[in-house]
Curated annotation (Swiss-Prot):
InterPro entries listed in its UniProt record: Aminopeptidase_N-like_N, Aminopeptidase_N-like_N_sf, ERAP1-like_C_dom, M1_APN-typ, Peptidase_M1, Peptidase_M1_aminopeptidases, Peptidase_M1_dom, Peptidase_M4/M1_CTD_sf
The protein's required cofactors: Zn(2+)
EC number: 3.4.11.2
Binding sites annotated in the UniProt record for Zn(2+): 305, 309, 328
GO molecular function: alanyl aminopeptidase activity; metalloaminopeptidase activity; peptide binding; zinc ion binding
Domain of life: Eukaryota
Name assigned to this protein: Aminopeptidase M1-B
Naturally occurring in which organism (per UniProt): Oryza sativa subsp. japonica
Subunit structure: Homodimer.
Membrane topology: Peripheral membrane protein
Amino acid sequence: MAASPEQFRGQARLPRCASPLSYDLRLRPDLAACAFSGSAAVAVAVSAPTRFLVLNAAELAVDGSSVRFQDLVPSEVVQFEEDEIVVIGFGQDLPIGEGVLKMDFTGTLNDQMRGFYRSKYEYKGESRNMAVTQFEAADARRCFPCWDEPAFKAKFKLTLEVPSELVALSNMPVIKETVHGPLKTVYYEESPLMSTYLVAIVVGLFDYIEGSTLEGTKVRVYTQVGKSNQGKFALDVAVKSLDLFKDYFATPYPLPKLDMVAIPDFAAGAMENYGLVTYRETALLYDELLSSASNKQQVAITVAHELAHQWFGNLVTMEWWTHLWLNEGFASWVSYLAVEALFPEWNNWTQFLDETTSGLRLDALAESHPIEVDINHASEIDAIFDSISYDKGASVIRMLQSYLGAERFQKALASYIKKYAYSNAKTEDLWAVLEEESGEPVKDLMTTWTKQQGYPVIYAKLDGHDLHLEQAQFLSDGSSGPGLWIVPITSCCGSYDAQKKFLLKGKTDKVHIDLTASQNAGGEKGENCWIKLNVDQTGFYRVKYDDELAAGLEKAIKANKLSLMDKIGIVEDSYSLSVARKQTLTSLLRLLNAYRNESDYTVLSHVTSVCLGIDKISVDATPELSRDIKQLLINLLLSAAKTLGWDPKEGESHLDVMLRSLLLIALVKLGHDETINEGVRRFHIFIKDRKTNILPPDTRKASYLAVMRTVTTSSRAGYDALLKIYRETAEAQEKSRILGSLSSCLDKDIVLEALNFMLTDEVRNQDAFYVLGGISLEGREVAWAWLKENWDHVLKTWPSSSLISDFVKSTVSRFTTEEKAAEVSEFFAGKTKPSFERALKQSLERVRISARWIESIRSEPNLAQTVNELLQHDM
């Protein structure tokens, strides 16, 4: 059979017989017509006999008559839309060596926040379009034909033709501009070797502010006109982060400039394009008067994360998407390192346990996936930008750093960056460098964590002076998987002075423990008689203690003998073990009682999350007890909340500001009348006078949620007042606060109204997930009925994986019965797509886990008695 273009269909990757060396691209975006045209001249190296050039193109019209390779005219130019490729065939084999491929093409500036797209903004009261790119993972092919895989690194030289009054930015600095009346041509310097997914273009009206690093690299923050002041905080973090990373990686920042731009419509949080980082507004802008402390923290972490990518991801790039975690896990881990250095008072490494927790919760599902995951089609890539690649990735890096030691680890990373700069690497390449530098068996240890999904629970049992350990794969459904890990075990006994460290290589092991240090003079067991495994939660695993060890830790928590990280680890492990039916809800409630005098934000953020989880399940599991359980949880949080009150105090810490917000929101969600009434009272004052300081940004969300708890169809003034604020504010953070409150109403008709409001032009598509995230238990049936009715529209409007997955997760995961799981499965039968298939399976698994947990709670003999006892104790 003669070779034909058909042979290239259905392949995971492009053929390797030709590869690009450099691209010379000219693009003309037409912002009024929402279209663009372009031409490409690509220097190509042909390395093996072939008569075809195969590259990626999607939603582009390639002009076949314009295509040339050197002076050869192709015999055929065929586009396969489903495979997102264009195949250019010639009458004979192409000469081995270098040649230039030329072609013209046209496309649409879409409204789907991927490829080359348009974003709406207001200028002087009128709506305008800006042109923006978002190419990760596989969408550069929607802007120009290219070899759209990370390993095909090339140099890029761009030329843009744009309206002369607009700012036009790309990865590299401008060489020159020539103006021809209403249009100008902008020429950019050629980039170093880079992957296609990092190419970027932004064209629109902007203000900017500027700073520079110690090396003299110019850093700018671009914002909508009039908002540049809100870029100051991010600029400061960016300049300091670049200096810090230069030292940490022992390699200078690779480009001549760095621009950061706030984009009004943006699907992700931010994107690390080389030298031109794009952000949604809430992730870059910070306003002293209008932003909350948690917004400030989010900006710092996001900026540090994206700038870490300039080394880890951009300079050294993963060879294929299987190794995505090398990009994301490292950028997440290193962003905490930077923010800890810049803001030590934020206690950032303790807050890092938020990441570890979300990684552990997702990875306890049978429908999780390994850190290194096989990718066979571009449509599968988006779905792995999840808590496994980011949070588990970052957590196993922290575990490895803790095992090897910070200095050795840093030295090895610097060697890795030097070795693979301007090139690509696989996970094994990193292990090889770390192994060489440290002399430790890194590859054997880490392969168990990256190539198999899941993680272990370590069962710990004390027998005299011997501590017996046994590992088994932990799954939230209560079963044990087949996994076996090499586990870095750390332990301390009675104090943090003498810690033991060793590797658990098999299923079981035992350790000799010296208990004398932890006993009172008389030999009896006091508050120092405790043994804690996984010290400071550096390991990515859970621990199930026997009753004696658990009692010792409970005493130690009450006596405040444990570190913040260990207090977090114990309550998180206990909650997850309860969900998996490995311990009772009764014992979890007793443990929570030990935290009643806790006042630290980092610990209480985990305690409140556990409280809200218990509250949700108890409504379905024990309706007759749920009021009492609510009261118990309220009592647990109340003293810390009363100490802080509603009003900020002079000179209080950043973490106390965050704690106030956290506790008030939790008390409102738990239905605490006093907090709800106070939130409503303050809201009424606030809507009469927006300049009042009775509701600063940090307590606004609690107040808005309180208002929505009192709204009904017949008494809806609060809902309408919130909508009015939404329509009048220009601040993205304030808009997101309101959207997250509207759907939390207990009245089903109002929930429906909020969901329908989300479909209007008044809500940007990127912001839908705020509304979805706010849905109350009372609104779950309405939300599910709404999703079924609007599914086709939703699928068309939100094609991006992360956003469509939010719709599925938010509506499905709140259910708790096998019948509901069956109903959901039936609805989606024949409707699933790779972009949300994993999210659907995980959501259904969560429903079934809840159903089993409920069954188990109903059969607990002492639950009512314990709840009663603990309530009596509170009186």
